[in-house]
A protein has these predicted regions:
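Glycine- and acidic/polar-rich repeat regions and solenoidal domains
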Residues: 3-203
């Protein structure tokens, strides 16, 4: 708790690139994302030696940027039984990594049975939400509950309870939203100007 930035990081190896868009501004951010995937594969990134973390039964609160964050390193992981609250509510940071749970490339990651409340954004899944399942979570009193951005799927959002005034934003393709209780607004749009990298299924 009370981490200035992140409580738990399931990050990626710095050798695949670290914040290159901000440092160089030579090309769009999604191009660096493509390159990070390619570099990771060249460095031996695979299911046998990356990811497969379990983050369970934690109370994570009062963090400045995010509660749990991951980029490629969060693949094949399971996040469950956590209570996450008051994340980014002091507005110390602005940007694209603000959420209770913020994952890039959450390939085959399971996020279930968490209670996420009183956050700026509860869960933000970005780039390569592929084989991901968000299931049986309770969202209350967030500014936004869920955002899925620039992903091709497939991913599943099922049996969640979304009670915040703004339930979710979907700027992706390939998602199935099934058996959720949705009490707030929803927004859906196509984001076709940024291509998404992908891995072969379950790799």
């Amino acid at each position: 708790h009370d981490a200035k930035c992140s409580a738990v990081s399931l990050g990626k190896d710095e050798k695949t690139g670290d914040n290159l868009f901000t440092k160089t501004k030579r090309k769009p951010g999604y191009t660096y994302q493509y390159e990070a995937v390619g570099k990771a594969l060249q460095l031996g990134w695979n299911k046998d030696n990356i990811g497969s973390h379990i983050v369970r039964n934690n109370i994570i609160h009062d963090c400045g940027q995010n509660g749990i964050v991951g980029h490629l390193g969060c693949v094949f992981s399971e996040i469950y039984g956590n209570e996450i609250f008051r994340i980014a509510t002091k507005h110390e940071f602005f940007g694209y990594e603000i959420a209770g749970i913020k994952f890039h490339a959450a390939i085959d990651t399971q996020i279930h049975h968490n209670y996420i409340h009183d956050c700026t954004l509860a869960i933000w899944l970005d780039w390569e939400t592929q084989g991901t399942r968000v299931s049986c979570n309770l969202f209350t009193d967030n500014i936004r509950d869920l955002m899925v951005e620039v992903s091709h799927g497939p991913y599943l959002v099922d049996n969640n309870i979304f009670t915040s005034p703004y339930s979710f934003e979907n700027a992706s393709q390939g998602g199935a939203y099934v058996h959720n209780l949705v009490l707030g607004n929803m927004k859906r749009w196509n984001e076709l100007n940024r291509s998404t990298p992908y891995h072969f299924p379950h790799t």
